[in-house]
């Protein structure tokens, strides 16, 4: 199946219109105006080792590609990845780190995120986490091995709002990756 081209909807200023049309192109295989749901686990191959862009839905699927393209446009990003759950996405991001790396995280996080960091990754991956109020002078917690700042805004459960511009500016100054979980805000409210 041919890869879809990125739509030109980034030129549209109205978010409501973008949210309806982002990532949507007619299906190149069938001509369907809306993307079909490909509920298959495997894709036929002409010959062994020669696929048509898809082998298994667990690695890629045309339906998921459209979802990811839509999310990237809504977030004004270059690429998006869809996961089965938020914690699966968080795990993939944290797994970018190496043993001995340090993360500064907001002190008010979703409980599942806190447990993933404090009870699983700190022990299984030897990653050091410092939980602080990122709206204060968190830069005093930056260490030589700090590789990531983890922000949640609005936070869960207290709905604290983080100053993303300030956090990002400090992180860039120290060449630290900033990750922001905006589950509560969505692209509608967090631009």
Positions of predicted regions on the chain:
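N-terminal "arm"/small-domain region of PLP-dependent enzymes with the aminotransferase-like
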Residues: 2-61, 67-70
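Conserved PLP-enzyme active-site core in the AAT-like
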Residues: 7-11, 21, 80-191
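A broad structural signal for alpha-helix termini and local helix breaks/kinks
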Residues: 30, 75, 124-125
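Conserved N-terminal alpha-helix of the aminotransferase class I/II PLP-enzyme fold
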Residues: 42-91, 95-96, 112-120
């Amino acid at each position: 199946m041919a890869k879809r081209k990125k739509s030109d909807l980034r030129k549209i200023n109205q978010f409501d219109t973008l949210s309806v049309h982002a990532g949507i192109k007619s299906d190149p295989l069938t001509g369907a105006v809306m993307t079909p749901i490909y509920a298959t686990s495997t894709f036929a191959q002409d010959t062994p080792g020669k696929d048509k862009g898809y082998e298994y839905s667990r690695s890629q699927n045309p339906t998921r590609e459209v979802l990811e393209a839509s999310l990237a446009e809504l977030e004004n990003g270059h690429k998006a990845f869809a996961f089965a759950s938020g914690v699966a996405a968080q795990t993939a991001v944290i797994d970018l780190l190496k043993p001995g790396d340090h993360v500064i995280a907001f002190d008010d996080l979703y409980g599942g995120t806190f447990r993933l960091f404090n009870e699983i990754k700190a022990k299984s991956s030897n990653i050091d986490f410092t939980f602080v109020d990122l709206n204060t002078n968190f830069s005093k917690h930056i260490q030589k091995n700090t590789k990531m700042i983890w922000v949640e805004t609005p936070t869960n459960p207290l709905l604290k709002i983080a100053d993303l511009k300030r956090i990002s500016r400090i992180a860039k100054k120290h060449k630290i990756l900033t990750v922001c979980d905006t589950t509560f805000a969505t692209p509608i409210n967090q631009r």
